[in-house]
Amino acid sequence: MTRLAIIGAGIAGRSLLYALAKGNKKFSEITLFDSDSFAHTCSLRSTAIVAPRGLSLGHSDLGDLLVGAFQTFSSHIENDRPAGVFPITQYTGGLSKLDDLKKRYPNGEFAKDFSLFSFRSDVYMACENAYLIDPEIYLEWLLNQSSTLPLIQKNDFVLSVDEISEGVEVKTQNGYTHVFDAVIFAGGSVNRFWNKQSNDQLSNIKPVQGSYLEFRNVNLGHHSYSLTLDGDNLVYHAHSHKLLIGSTSLVTHYELPEMNSLLEIYKRLQSSLELKLPDFSAAEVKVGIREKAPKRSPYIKNHGKCWWIGGYYKNGYSLGYDWAKKIIGKMEIHA
Ligand SMILES: Cc1cc2nc3c(=O)[nH]c(=O)nc-3n(C[C@H](O)[C@H](O)[C@H](O)COP(=O)(O)OP(=O)(O)OC[C@H]3O[C@@H](n4cnc5c(N)ncnc54)[C@H](O)[C@@H]3O)c2cc1C
Protein backbone atom coordinates (compact mmCIF):
# COMPACT_ATOMS: atom_id res chain seq x y z
CA MET A 1 0.00 0.00 0.00
CA THR A 2 1.80 3.16 -1.10
CA ARG A 3 -0.53 5.74 -2.62
CA LEU A 4 -3.32 6.89 -0.29
CA ALA A 5 -6.21 9.28 -0.98
CA ILE A 6 -8.12 10.97 1.81
CA ILE A 7 -11.43 12.56 0.84
CA GLY A 8 -12.26 15.38 3.26
CA ALA A 9 -10.15 17.93 5.16
CA GLY A 10 -12.42 18.51 8.15
CA ILE A 11 -11.43 17.37 11.62
CA ALA A 12 -11.68 13.70 10.52
CA GLY A 13 -9.38 14.08 7.49
CA ARG A 14 -6.84 16.36 9.17
CA SER A 15 -6.65 14.22 12.31
CA LEU A 16 -5.89 11.31 9.99
CA LEU A 17 -3.00 13.24 8.46
CA TYR A 18 -1.72 14.18 11.90
CA ALA A 19 -1.90 10.59 13.15
CA LEU A 20 -0.12 9.40 9.99
CA ALA A 21 2.61 12.01 10.49
CA LYS A 22 3.13 10.88 14.09
CA GLY A 23 3.11 7.16 13.27
CA ASN A 24 4.89 5.04 10.72
CA LYS A 25 4.91 6.77 7.37
CA LYS A 26 3.88 3.81 5.25
CA PHE A 27 2.65 5.76 2.21
CA SER A 28 4.82 7.11 -0.61
CA GLU A 29 2.15 9.67 -1.54
CA ILE A 30 -0.93 11.00 0.26
CA THR A 31 -3.48 13.07 -1.66
CA LEU A 32 -6.01 15.11 0.29
CA PHE A 33 -9.17 16.09 -1.59
CA ASP A 34 -11.45 18.79 -0.21
CA SER A 35 -13.83 21.45 -1.42
CA ASP A 36 -15.40 23.69 1.21
CA SER A 37 -17.07 25.68 -1.55
CA PHE A 38 -18.78 22.56 -2.94
CA ALA A 39 -19.63 20.81 0.36
CA HIS A 40 -19.30 23.11 3.36
CA THR A 41 -16.89 21.86 6.00
CA CYS A 42 -18.91 21.23 9.18
CA SER A 43 -15.73 21.46 11.27
CA LEU A 44 -15.51 25.19 10.42
CA ARG A 45 -19.13 25.74 11.48
CA SER A 46 -19.00 24.15 14.90
CA THR A 47 -19.12 25.43 18.48
CA ALA A 48 -16.23 22.98 19.00
CA ILE A 49 -16.12 22.23 22.73
CA VAL A 50 -14.48 19.06 24.00
CA ALA A 51 -15.83 18.19 27.44
CA PRO A 52 -16.50 15.00 29.43
CA ARG A 53 -20.19 16.08 29.81
CA GLY A 54 -20.59 14.15 33.04
CA LEU A 55 -19.96 10.80 31.35
CA SER A 56 -18.23 7.95 33.15
CA LEU A 57 -17.23 4.45 32.12
CA GLY A 58 -19.54 1.44 32.34
CA HIS A 59 -22.96 2.88 31.44
CA SER A 60 -23.17 2.60 27.64
CA ASP A 61 -20.96 1.70 24.69
CA LEU A 62 -21.18 5.24 23.33
CA GLY A 63 -20.40 6.70 26.77
CA ASP A 64 -17.31 4.48 27.11
CA LEU A 65 -16.18 5.44 23.66
CA LEU A 66 -16.54 9.18 24.36
CA VAL A 67 -14.75 8.90 27.71
CA GLY A 68 -11.86 7.13 25.92
CA ALA A 69 -11.80 9.81 23.21
CA PHE A 70 -11.72 12.58 25.83
CA GLN A 71 -8.73 10.93 27.50
CA THR A 72 -6.90 10.64 24.17
CA PHE A 73 -7.67 14.28 23.35
CA SER A 74 -6.49 15.47 26.81
CA SER A 75 -3.16 13.62 26.40
CA HIS A 76 -2.80 15.07 22.91
CA ILE A 77 -3.23 18.60 24.32
CA GLU A 78 -0.85 17.97 27.21
CA ASN A 79 1.89 16.38 25.09
CA ASP A 80 1.58 18.18 21.75
CA ARG A 81 0.36 21.65 22.85
CA PRO A 82 -1.56 22.39 19.63
CA ALA A 83 -2.45 25.94 18.61
CA GLY A 84 -6.13 26.85 18.73
CA VAL A 85 -7.05 24.69 21.74
CA PHE A 86 -7.70 26.42 25.07
CA PRO A 87 -8.28 24.72 28.44
CA ILE A 88 -11.52 26.10 29.91
CA THR A 89 -14.22 25.31 32.44
CA GLN A 90 -17.44 23.83 31.07
CA TYR A 91 -20.42 24.90 33.23
CA THR A 92 -23.49 22.70 32.86
CA GLY A 93 -26.80 23.07 34.65
CA GLY A 94 -30.37 24.19 34.52
CA LEU A 95 -33.79 24.25 36.08
CA SER A 96 -35.49 21.44 34.19
CA LYS A 97 -34.92 17.67 34.02
CA LEU A 98 -33.17 17.97 37.38
CA ASP A 99 -33.19 14.22 38.12
CA ASP A 100 -31.21 13.52 34.92
CA LEU A 101 -28.92 16.44 35.56
CA LYS A 102 -28.13 15.39 39.15
CA LYS A 103 -27.52 11.81 38.06
CA ARG A 104 -25.02 12.95 35.46
CA TYR A 105 -23.48 15.70 37.59
CA PRO A 106 -23.80 14.56 41.24
CA ASN A 107 -21.34 17.22 42.42
CA GLY A 108 -23.42 20.19 41.30
CA GLU A 109 -25.06 22.73 43.58
CA PHE A 110 -28.01 25.11 43.64
CA ALA A 111 -26.96 28.75 43.50
CA LYS A 112 -27.92 32.12 42.10
CA ASP A 113 -24.29 33.17 41.79
CA PHE A 114 -21.96 30.53 40.45
CA SER A 115 -18.36 31.35 39.54
CA LEU A 116 -18.45 33.86 36.65
CA PHE A 117 -22.25 33.85 36.38
CA SER A 118 -25.22 35.44 38.10
CA PHE A 119 -28.62 33.93 37.36
CA ARG A 120 -32.05 35.49 37.92
CA SER A 121 -33.02 32.54 40.16
CA ASP A 122 -31.31 29.53 41.77
CA VAL A 123 -30.08 27.01 39.19
CA TYR A 124 -28.41 23.62 39.57
CA MET A 125 -24.83 24.00 38.27
CA ALA A 126 -21.77 21.79 37.92
CA CYS A 127 -18.41 22.39 36.32
CA GLU A 128 -15.72 20.29 34.70
CA ASN A 129 -12.41 20.80 32.93
CA ALA A 130 -12.83 21.03 29.17
CA TYR A 131 -11.31 22.48 25.99
CA LEU A 132 -12.50 25.26 23.73
CA ILE A 133 -11.33 25.05 20.14
CA ASP A 134 -10.84 27.74 17.55
CA PRO A 135 -11.51 25.54 14.51
CA GLU A 136 -9.60 27.62 11.96
CA ILE A 137 -6.44 27.74 14.08
CA TYR A 138 -6.50 24.11 15.20
CA LEU A 139 -7.29 22.74 11.72
CA GLU A 140 -4.44 24.80 10.28
CA TRP A 141 -2.10 23.54 13.01
CA LEU A 142 -3.00 19.91 12.21
CA LEU A 143 -2.12 20.50 8.57
CA ASN A 144 1.16 22.27 9.39
CA GLN A 145 2.21 19.42 11.67
CA SER A 146 1.73 17.02 8.77
CA SER A 147 4.41 18.74 6.67
CA THR A 148 6.69 15.69 7.03
CA LEU A 149 4.22 13.65 4.97
CA PRO A 150 4.47 13.28 1.18
CA LEU A 151 1.24 15.29 0.94
CA ILE A 152 -0.52 16.65 -2.14
CA GLN A 153 -3.53 18.88 -1.52
CA LYS A 154 -6.28 19.11 -4.12
CA ASN A 155 -9.00 21.71 -3.93
CA ASP A 156 -11.27 19.49 -5.97
CA PHE A 157 -14.42 17.44 -5.48
CA VAL A 158 -14.38 13.66 -5.93
CA LEU A 159 -17.19 12.51 -8.21
CA SER A 160 -16.50 8.79 -8.58
CA VAL A 161 -14.45 6.10 -6.88
CA ASP A 162 -14.12 2.66 -8.52
CA GLU A 163 -11.92 -0.30 -7.75
CA ILE A 164 -10.01 -1.42 -10.82
CA SER A 165 -7.23 -4.01 -11.23
CA GLU A 166 -4.43 -1.41 -10.66
CA GLY A 167 -6.03 0.04 -7.52
CA VAL A 168 -8.80 2.57 -6.90
CA GLU A 169 -9.69 5.01 -9.65
CA VAL A 170 -10.81 8.46 -8.50
CA LYS A 171 -12.42 10.99 -10.86
CA THR A 172 -12.91 14.61 -9.91
CA GLN A 173 -14.99 17.69 -10.68
CA ASN A 174 -12.01 19.36 -12.37
CA GLY A 175 -11.75 16.49 -14.82
CA TYR A 176 -8.77 14.62 -13.36
CA THR A 177 -8.41 10.86 -12.98
CA HIS A 178 -6.06 9.46 -10.33
CA VAL A 179 -5.28 5.90 -9.23
CA PHE A 180 -4.53 5.04 -5.60
CA ASP A 181 -3.79 1.92 -3.60
CA ALA A 182 -6.25 2.87 -0.88
CA VAL A 183 -8.93 5.52 -0.33
CA ILE A 184 -10.31 6.81 2.97
CA PHE A 185 -13.64 8.63 2.87
CA ALA A 186 -13.62 11.28 5.61
CA GLY A 187 -16.26 13.42 3.94
CA GLY A 188 -18.52 14.09 6.95
CA SER A 189 -22.21 14.23 6.03
CA VAL A 190 -21.28 13.63 2.36
CA ASN A 191 -20.03 10.11 3.20
CA ARG A 192 -23.61 8.84 3.00
CA PHE A 193 -23.64 9.27 -0.80
CA TRP A 194 -21.06 6.51 -1.20
CA ASN A 195 -23.43 3.65 -0.36
CA LYS A 196 -22.62 1.68 -3.50
CA GLN A 197 -18.97 1.19 -2.65
CA SER A 198 -19.62 0.43 1.01
CA ASN A 199 -22.20 -2.26 0.21
CA ASP A 200 -24.94 0.02 1.49
CA GLN A 201 -23.41 0.10 4.95
CA LEU A 202 -23.90 3.86 5.15
CA SER A 203 -27.56 3.97 4.17
CA ASN A 204 -28.88 4.60 7.71
CA ILE A 205 -26.85 7.74 8.21
CA LYS A 206 -28.80 10.98 8.60
CA PRO A 207 -27.62 14.54 7.96
CA VAL A 208 -28.51 16.80 10.90
CA GLN A 209 -28.34 20.55 10.59
CA GLY A 210 -26.94 22.55 13.52
CA SER A 211 -26.93 26.35 13.67
CA TYR A 212 -25.73 28.98 16.11
CA LEU A 213 -25.26 32.74 16.46
CA GLU A 214 -21.79 34.25 16.32
CA PHE A 215 -21.22 37.75 17.74
CA ARG A 216 -17.90 39.54 17.15
CA ASN A 217 -16.12 42.25 19.15
CA VAL A 218 -17.73 41.16 22.42
CA ASN A 219 -15.85 41.70 25.66
CA LEU A 220 -16.94 39.42 28.50
CA GLY A 221 -13.64 39.38 30.36
CA HIS A 222 -10.30 37.60 30.23
CA HIS A 223 -11.55 34.01 30.58
CA SER A 224 -12.94 31.81 27.84
CA TYR A 225 -15.74 29.50 28.97
CA SER A 226 -18.66 27.38 27.88
CA LEU A 227 -22.01 27.42 29.64
CA THR A 228 -24.78 24.91 28.90
CA LEU A 229 -28.06 25.87 30.55
CA ASP A 230 -30.98 23.49 30.02
CA GLY A 231 -29.34 22.45 26.75
CA ASP A 232 -28.74 26.01 25.49
CA ASN A 233 -25.09 26.94 24.92
CA LEU A 234 -23.20 30.15 25.43
CA VAL A 235 -19.52 29.97 24.49
CA TYR A 236 -17.12 32.86 24.96
CA HIS A 237 -13.76 33.03 23.13
CA ALA A 238 -11.71 35.52 25.17
CA HIS A 239 -8.74 35.38 22.73
CA SER A 240 -10.84 36.57 19.77
CA HIS A 241 -13.74 38.34 21.59
CA LYS A 242 -16.31 36.06 19.99
CA LEU A 243 -19.55 34.95 21.61
CA LEU A 244 -21.42 31.92 20.31
CA ILE A 245 -25.04 31.14 21.21
CA GLY A 246 -26.91 28.06 20.11
CA SER A 247 -27.36 25.53 18.88
CA THR A 248 -30.30 24.08 17.01
CA SER A 249 -30.67 20.51 15.78
CA LEU A 250 -32.80 19.56 12.80
CA VAL A 251 -32.78 16.33 10.79
CA THR A 252 -32.31 17.75 7.32
CA HIS A 253 -29.60 18.16 4.69
CA TYR A 254 -30.26 21.84 3.90
CA GLU A 255 -28.54 24.84 5.41
CA LEU A 256 -31.38 27.36 5.84
CA PRO A 257 -31.29 27.91 9.63
CA GLU A 258 -34.25 27.85 12.00
CA MET A 259 -34.22 31.54 12.98
CA ASN A 260 -37.15 31.20 15.41
CA SER A 261 -35.39 28.45 17.36
CA LEU A 262 -32.22 30.56 17.51
CA LEU A 263 -34.23 33.54 18.76
CA GLU A 264 -35.85 31.35 21.45
CA ILE A 265 -32.45 30.12 22.65
CA TYR A 266 -31.18 33.72 22.75
CA LYS A 267 -34.25 34.88 24.72
CA ARG A 268 -34.07 31.96 27.19
CA LEU A 269 -30.42 32.72 27.95
CA GLN A 270 -31.10 36.46 28.20
CA SER A 271 -33.95 35.87 30.65
CA SER A 272 -31.96 33.43 32.86
CA LEU A 273 -28.66 35.28 33.02
CA GLU A 274 -27.78 38.61 34.63
CA LEU A 275 -25.79 39.48 31.53
CA LYS A 276 -26.50 41.93 28.74
CA LEU A 277 -26.20 40.01 25.50
CA PRO A 278 -25.39 41.84 22.25
CA ASP A 279 -28.39 42.65 20.05
CA PHE A 280 -29.78 39.59 18.28
CA SER A 281 -29.57 41.45 14.95
CA ALA A 282 -25.77 41.79 15.32
CA ALA A 283 -25.25 38.04 15.01
CA GLU A 284 -23.89 36.16 12.07
CA VAL A 285 -25.68 32.84 11.72
CA LYS A 286 -23.46 29.80 11.23
CA VAL A 287 -24.80 26.50 9.93
CA GLY A 288 -23.12 23.11 9.81
CA ILE A 289 -24.38 19.74 8.62
CA ARG A 290 -23.47 16.92 11.00
CA GLU A 291 -23.52 13.22 10.33
CA LYS A 292 -25.66 11.06 12.61
CA ALA A 293 -25.14 7.31 12.33
CA PRO A 294 -27.33 4.66 14.05
CA LYS A 295 -27.08 4.84 17.87
CA ARG A 296 -25.21 8.16 17.41
CA SER A 297 -22.14 6.04 17.11
CA PRO A 298 -19.03 6.83 15.04
CA TYR A 299 -18.00 4.21 12.50
CA ILE A 300 -15.03 2.76 10.67
CA LYS A 301 -15.96 0.63 7.67
CA ASN A 302 -13.94 -1.19 5.08
CA HIS A 303 -14.73 -2.74 1.71
CA GLY A 304 -11.85 -3.84 -0.51
CA LYS A 305 -9.37 -0.97 -0.79
CA CYS A 306 -11.84 1.64 0.47
CA TRP A 307 -12.33 2.78 4.04
CA TRP A 308 -14.93 5.05 5.63
CA ILE A 309 -14.62 6.99 8.87
CA GLY A 310 -17.19 9.33 10.38
CA GLY A 311 -20.51 9.55 12.20
CA TYR A 312 -18.99 12.04 14.62
CA TYR A 313 -22.30 13.86 15.04
CA LYS A 314 -21.92 16.25 18.03
CA ASN A 315 -18.44 15.05 19.01
CA GLY A 316 -16.17 15.60 16.02
CA TYR A 317 -13.43 17.37 17.92
CA SER A 318 -13.44 14.81 20.74
CA LEU A 319 -13.33 11.83 18.39
CA GLY A 320 -11.07 13.13 15.61
CA TYR A 321 -7.64 12.12 16.86
CA ASP A 322 -8.74 9.02 18.80
CA TRP A 323 -10.54 7.55 15.78
CA ALA A 324 -7.79 8.55 13.36
CA LYS A 325 -5.44 6.35 15.37
CA LYS A 326 -8.03 3.56 15.39
CA ILE A 327 -8.50 3.45 11.61
CA ILE A 328 -4.74 3.57 10.98
CA GLY A 329 -4.31 0.62 13.35
CA LYS A 330 -6.98 -1.35 11.47
CA MET A 331 -5.48 -0.52 8.06
CA GLU A 332 -2.07 -1.74 9.22
CA ILE A 333 -3.60 -5.09 10.18
CA HIS A 334 -5.17 -5.37 6.69
CA ALA A 335 -1.99 -4.31 4.84
C1 LIG B 1 -23.69 23.71 15.33
C2 LIG B 1 -22.70 22.61 15.61
C3 LIG B 1 -22.12 22.52 16.86
C4 LIG B 1 -21.19 21.51 17.13
N1 LIG B 1 -20.58 21.47 18.34
C5 LIG B 1 -19.61 20.56 18.58
C6 LIG B 1 -18.89 20.57 19.80
O1 LIG B 1 -19.14 21.41 20.67
N2 LIG B 1 -17.91 19.65 19.98
C7 LIG B 1 -17.60 18.73 19.02
O2 LIG B 1 -16.67 17.93 19.24
N3 LIG B 1 -18.28 18.66 17.85
C8 LIG B 1 -19.27 19.56 17.62
N4 LIG B 1 -19.97 19.54 16.44
C9 LIG B 1 -19.77 18.42 15.53
C10 LIG B 1 -18.52 18.54 14.70
O3 LIG B 1 -18.39 19.85 14.21
C11 LIG B 1 -18.61 17.53 13.54
O4 LIG B 1 -18.82 16.24 14.05
C12 LIG B 1 -17.32 17.52 12.74
O5 LIG B 1 -17.01 18.82 12.31
C13 LIG B 1 -17.41 16.57 11.55
O6 LIG B 1 -16.13 16.56 10.96
P1 LIG B 1 -15.84 15.77 9.62
O7 LIG B 1 -14.40 15.96 9.33
O8 LIG B 1 -16.38 14.38 9.74
O9 LIG B 1 -16.75 16.48 8.51
P2 LIG B 1 -16.56 17.93 7.83
O10 LIG B 1 -15.98 18.89 8.77
O11 LIG B 1 -17.87 18.26 7.20
O12 LIG B 1 -15.46 17.68 6.70
C14 LIG B 1 -15.74 16.91 5.56
C15 LIG B 1 -15.03 17.55 4.38
O13 LIG B 1 -15.08 16.62 3.31
C16 LIG B 1 -15.20 17.35 2.11
N5 LIG B 1 -15.78 16.43 1.12
C17 LIG B 1 -16.89 15.66 1.26
N6 LIG B 1 -17.09 14.94 0.15
C18 LIG B 1 -16.11 15.26 -0.70
C19 LIG B 1 -15.79 14.85 -2.04
N7 LIG B 1 -16.54 13.95 -2.68
N8 LIG B 1 -14.69 15.40 -2.63
C20 LIG B 1 -13.91 16.31 -1.97
N9 LIG B 1 -14.18 16.73 -0.70
C21 LIG B 1 -15.25 16.21 -0.10
C22 LIG B 1 -16.11 18.52 2.43
O14 LIG B 1 -15.86 19.59 1.54
C23 LIG B 1 -15.66 18.84 3.87
O15 LIG B 1 -14.70 19.87 3.87
C24 LIG B 1 -20.90 20.54 16.13
C25 LIG B 1 -21.48 20.63 14.87
C26 LIG B 1 -22.38 21.67 14.60
C27 LIG B 1 -22.99 21.77 13.24
Where are these regions (language model features)?
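A conserved short coil-to-beta-strand element within the FAD-binding core of flavoproteins
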Residues: 152-168
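Short beta-strand to alpha-helix junction loop
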Residues: 57-69, 125-141, 256-261, 318-321
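Dinucleotide-binding Rossmann-like beta1-alpha1 core, especially the glycine-rich loop
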Residues: 47-127
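Flavin-dependent oxidoreductases
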Residues: 176, 180-267, 275-281
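Conserved Rossmann-like nucleotide-cofactor binding loop
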Residues: 12, 38, 190
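C-terminal catalytic lobe of FAD-dependent flavoproteins
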Residues: 280-335
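Glycine-rich FAD pyrophosphate-binding loop
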Residues: 21-43
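Beta1/beta-strand and adjacent pyrophosphate-binding region of the FAD-binding site
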Residues: 1-12
